[in-house]
């Protein structure tokens, strides 16, 4: 926890034009379920202020956040996926950035000496394993368990060939290893020139590689510049728990870190939630800002 109590440092509703939020560790609990308190708060906003944008900014692909997007009808607004490398508006892709195939293969080559490292790549829809890693794809399976759409039907060798040919257009790459061995991955990736990719981390068992020019901050700037130009950055409130949320925190006028988030997120955010994601952190903050009545009962959450 930050040495300074930032739990009450929140904007007033009349100064806000948009909410933008991370997903894992922020909207979802440790079991990767949408917390009811947060669903309730966001549903209230959708009902009372139907034109108030609620934007998802996540490392996940669009298909992996259906449990949030569909019940709240968030296709009405833009969304930033794969750490800002893919932007949607009204459910359609309006921008996508990609890693070069040769860069992906250089990382595969650099990590092949460690058979415990699993390399996976993301396109707009699926995740593909290029190398299996520890204990028969243990960490790849962990991605599937948190909602990532992993294509287990495609052999690693086939996926590699499709990356090389450009048939699989790679938006993000993840280098996976057990959390206590992840420093080995950092050492390997640290030898690459910065212009080849940027690294970030949202999950404890992998380092993510994305195009150097894309992140959640650039996604937010694109949205307010090109899709919702009436929204000013200083009137945006952002929520997040990890390192990959810092670029978004830097652009948004208001930033809220989750109480049990990464120390760097708590340090950099203007505010911190009173409770963690297990207790509906985002919902708790929105209740205060939007003055949500205690007796408000949303429609049943169904997905």
Curated annotation (Swiss-Prot):
Modification type Phosphoserine: residues: 63
Pfam families given in the database record: Hydrolase_3
Subcellular location: Cytoplasm; Nucleus
EC number of the protein: 3.-.-.-
InterPro entries the record matches: HAD-like_sf, HAD-SF_hydro_IIB, HAD_sf
Sorted UniProt keywords: Cytoplasm, Hydrolase, Nucleus, Phosphoprotein
MF terms in GO: magnesium ion binding; phosphatase activity
Entry keyword annotation includes Cytoplasm: yes
Broad class of where this protein is predominantly found: cytoplasm
Cellular component GO terms held in the UniProt record: cytosol; nucleus
Lineage: superkingdom: Eukaryota
Coiled-coil residue windows: none
Sequence similarity: Belongs to the HAD-like hydrolase superfamily.
Protein name listed in UniProt: Uncharacterized hydrolase C25B8.12c
């Amino acid at each position: 926890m930050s040495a300074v109590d930032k739990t009450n440092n929140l904007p007033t509703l009349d100064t806000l034009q948009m909410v933008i939020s991370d997903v894992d560790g922020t909207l979802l609990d440790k079991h990767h379920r949408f917390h009811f308190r947060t669903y309730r708060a966001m549903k209230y906003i959708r009902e009372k202020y139907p034109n108030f944008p609620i934007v998802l900014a996540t490392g996940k692909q669009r298909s992996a956040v259906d449990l949030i997007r569909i019940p709240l009808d968030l296709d009405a607004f833009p969304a930033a996926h794969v750490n800002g490398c893919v932007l949607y508006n009204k459910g359609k892709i309006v921008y996508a950035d990609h890693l070069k195939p040769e860069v992906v293969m250089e990382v595969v080559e650099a990590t092949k000496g460690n058979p415990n490292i699993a390399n996976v790549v993301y396109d707009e829809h699926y995740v593909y394993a290029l190398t299996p890693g520890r204990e028969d794809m243990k960490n790849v399976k962990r991605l599937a368990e948190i909602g990532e759409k992993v294509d287990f039907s495609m052999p690693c060798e086939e996926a590699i060939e499709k990356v090389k040919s450009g048939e699989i257009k790679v938006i993000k790459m993840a280098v996976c290893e057990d959390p206590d061995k992840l420093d080995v991955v950092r050492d390997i990736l640290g030898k690459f020139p910065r212009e080849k990719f940027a690294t970030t981390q949202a999950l404890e068992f992998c380092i993510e590689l994305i195009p150097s020019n894309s992140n959640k901050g650039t996604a937010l700037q694109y949205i307010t510049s090109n899709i919702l130009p009436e929204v000013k950055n200083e009137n945006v409130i952002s929520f997040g728990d990890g390192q990959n949320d810092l670029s978004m925190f830097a652009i948004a006028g208001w930033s809220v870190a989750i109480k049990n988030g990464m120390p760097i997120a708590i340090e950099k955010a203007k505010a911190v939630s009173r409770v963690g994601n297990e207790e509906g952190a985002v919902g708790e903050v929105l209740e205060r800002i939007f003055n949500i009545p205690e007796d408000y009962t949303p429609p049943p959450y169904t997905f």
